Amino acid sequence: MGEQLGGLKRTHMCGELGVKDVGKSVVVMGWVNSRRDHGGLVFIDLRDRTGIVQIVFSEQVSKEVFEKVQSVRSEYVLAVEGEVVKRLPENVNPKIPTGEIEIYAKNLKILSKSETPPFPIEDRSNVSEAVRLKYRYLDLRRPSMQRNLITRFKLTQAVREFLNDNGFIEIETPMLIKSTPEGARDYLVPSRIYPGKFYALPQSPQIFKQLLMIAGFDRYYQIARCLRDEDLRADRQPEFTQIDIEMSFVEVEDVLDINERMIKHVFKKVLDVDLDIPFRRLTYQEAMERFGTDKPDLRFGMELKDLSDILRESEFNVFKNALKNGGSIRGINVKGAASMTRKQLDELVEFAKNFGAKGLLWMQVLEGEVKSPATKFLTEGELNKILERLEAEVGDLLLIVADKDEVVFDTLGHLRVEMAKRFNLIDESKYEFVWVVDFPLLEYDEEEKRYVAKHHPFTSPKDEDIDLLEKEPLKVRAKAYDIVLNGTEIGGGSIRIHDTELQKRMFKVLGFSEEEAWKKFGFLMEAFKYGAPPHGGIAYGLDRLAMIMTGSDTIRDVIAFPKTQNAVCLMSDAPSEVSEKQLKELHIKIDL
């Protein structure tokens, strides 16, 4: 059985001790990281969240304590009292901050014993993610995981600090809300008091933050828990955290400005990185045409170039058909990649097919010739113009796709990133932010045969496009903006509709009858009747931002207790079956 503290009080954290503490009597507490027995001396590295300190147990100092330490093993929890001593020069360990000192133990309490853990508690530990998630409390003892969660804490702390100083009020919104099935599936919570009725867990605080603006709070924020029952793609979680922000009496530039200043503050505070503001701005159209994506990674070039005008008269069927069907021909230049083998080029063609491309045309620019399956279909003039447009030099590889615009963009956008990774063109030390603005307000859903909101139904159209809402809905641009960091969207928002009539028109274009719109969003529509200010905001994916700031490979590494990709908690075994009694109370019958 473990000993009690018995009045012993910790004086220092393990990683905080240094030469300044030599001669002091200290009490440290933590876990045994490692143990080494050298006959008359036992060395223990004691670990807490601040780091490691070496403790020396010597027969000369205390025979009783020396005998007691013989039973101690890895991950035992100890309280140690002793004197801080400067190490001899030959024993200094430069790898750890406490490497110049050690503690000579005078008193030892074994607070808790440990079985041998299923994997070593160290960053080098080569263990499967499934085992790490099953024993998450052990995984979280590893220094890298503790650093990640402490960085995440510092991130939320810096966000709060900035927003508090800029007149924002933190307000919590409800977790049990009305289900409004638009977007992802809701998680439903049955009501025991009202049999047959259900609450939903919030996918975001969207409607409530708008109501807070109507209530006159002017500037709101919340570190909000959000839940979506969606089919999990790579690196999505059923529950996640948003930095949620809303402001009254603002236009797009006001929102972008305060967010740039917040991000600058956060990066300086957490990572000591100085960011230049304002960030770059790209319209949605420009981002698609230059980078093939609305989430462009600007740490490298390799921009898409439109070749359609050069090849308009081409006799090559692939080009002819693409242009005839309203598509385009575009290409990228991968500098210095002409040395790729035929096998590697064939793999690239297969890679391109994953994104709907029927094929991929490659050109190797060599000394005195251009090697490509397409050269025989091109005139010399066409070939020279392609080389000129793509700024080709000897040693370059040109990749060209001809298809519908969306296929061309998607394929070349992914190829651009793939080639940058293969040829190490990405400077991992850079943070490249960009605002993508002027998104289309609507998209057409072929399955449902109706228009759907690209962001959500409360996004305001640009003033100059309002008249197109019923006539040419797909031409309407939104007062919407996404913030992208190194090719990852970390946040997005919009100016909202604050006018009842415009909101009704929007619902109509989306195919909601007035009755249906009222049934889903009646309480918001009712609130609009009583004077709504112009308002807008943004929400950041906190997990994704923390992942980038810690250099982690997955958001699971910045969440204390994440679910797997199949939405399962391997540690607690959630979701699980519940008792018949619980189901009966809720008037629920399981029909599998």
From Swiss-Prot:
Q: What is its EC number?
A: 6.1.1.23
The domain of life is: Bacteria
- Sites where the protein binds L-aspartate: 182, 228, 455, 496
Keyword Nucleotide-binding in record = yes
Q: Where in the cell is it found?
A: Cytoplasm
InterPro entries recorded: Aa-tRNA-synt_II (IPR004364), aa-tRNA-synth_II (IPR006195), aa-tRNA-synth_II/BPL/LPL (IPR045864), Asp-tRNA-ligase_1 (IPR004524), Asp-tRNA-ligase_1_N (IPR047089), Asp/Asn-tRNA-synth_IIb (IPR002312), AspRS_core (IPR047090), GAD-like_sf (IPR004115)
Keyword field contains Membrane: no
Positions annotated to bind ATP: 228-230, 237, 489, 541-544
Q: Where is this site: Important for tRNA non-discrimination?
A: 38
Name its GO BP terms in alphabetical order: aspartyl-tRNA aminoacylation
Q: Which GO terms describe its molecular function?
A: aspartate-tRNA ligase activity; aspartate-tRNA(Asn) ligase activity; ATP binding; catalytic activity, acting on a protein; nucleic acid binding; transferase activity
The UniProt keyword set, sorted, is: Aminoacyl-tRNA synthetase, ATP-binding, Cytoplasm, Ligase, Nucleotide-binding, Protein biosynthesis
Q: Which CDD domains match?
A: AspRS_core, EcAspRS_like_N
Please give the Gene3D superfamilies that the UniProt record associates with this protein.
Answer: Bira Bifunctional Protein, Domain 2, GAD-like domain, Nucleic acid-binding proteins
What's any one GO cellular component for it?
cytoplasm
**What does it catalyze?**
tRNA(Asx) + L-aspartate + ATP = L-aspartyl-tRNA(Asx) + AMP + diphosphate
Return the annotated region ranges for Aspartate. Answer: 206-209
Q: Member of which family?
A: Belongs to the class-II aminoacyl-tRNA synthetase family. Type 1 subfamily.
PANTHER family in alphabetical order: ASPARTATE--TRNA LIGASE, MITOCHONDRIAL, ASPARTYL/LYSYL-TRNA SYNTHETASE
NCBIfam families tied to this protein:
aspS_bact, PRK00476.1
Q: What does this protein do?
A: Aspartyl-tRNA synthetase with relaxed tRNA specificity since it is able to aspartylate not only its cognate tRNA(Asp) but also tRNA(Asn). Reaction proceeds in two steps: L-aspartate is first activated by ATP to form Asp-AMP and then transferred to the acceptor end of tRNA(Asp/Asn).
Subunit and partners: Homodimer.
The name on file for this protein is Aspartate--tRNA(Asp/Asn) ligase
The organism is: Caldanaerobacter subterraneus subsp. tengcongensis (strain DSM 15242 / JCM 11007 / NBRC 100824 / MB4) (Thermoanaerobacter tengcongensis)
Q: What is the lineage of its organism?
A: Bacteria, Bacillati, Bacillota, Clostridia, Thermoanaerobacterales
